[in-house]
From Swiss-Prot:
Pfam families: Ribosomal_L33. Belongs to the bacterial ribosomal protein bL33 family. HAMAP family: Ribosomal_bL33. InterPro entries: Ribosomal_bL33 (IPR001705), Ribosomal_bL33_CS (IPR018264), Ribosomal_bL33_sf (IPR038584), Ribosomal_zn-bd (IPR011332). One of its GO terms (cellular component) is cytosolic large ribosomal subunit. It comes from Xanthomonas campestris pv. campestris (strain ATCC 33913 / DSM 3586 / NCPPB 528 / LMG 568 / P 25). It comes from the Bacteria. One of its GO terms (biological process) is translation. This is Large ribosomal subunit protein bL33. The keyword Acetylation does not apply. GO terms for molecular function: structural constituent of ribosome. Keywords: Ribonucleoprotein, Ribosomal protein.
């Protein structure tokens, strides 16, 4: 069976709260690590989330 075009990733909060979002990304269009501002409900602020592996 062929490998899919999208990888599942985990967006980990840079506020060190342990909160994360799971999403997927297209390997071909975004080969680098993703970073985005998202809401962290633990600190109740928008913080930078960085891509990490799903274990």
């Amino acid at each position: 069976m062929a490998k899919g075009k999208r990888d599942k990733i985990r967006m980990i909060s840079s506020a060190a709260t342990g909160h994360f979002y799971t999403t997927d990304k297209n390997k071909k269009n975004t080969p680098g690590k993703m970073e985005m501002m998202k809401y962290d409900p633990v600190v109740r602020k928008h913080v930078m989330y960085k891509e990490g592996k799903i274990k």
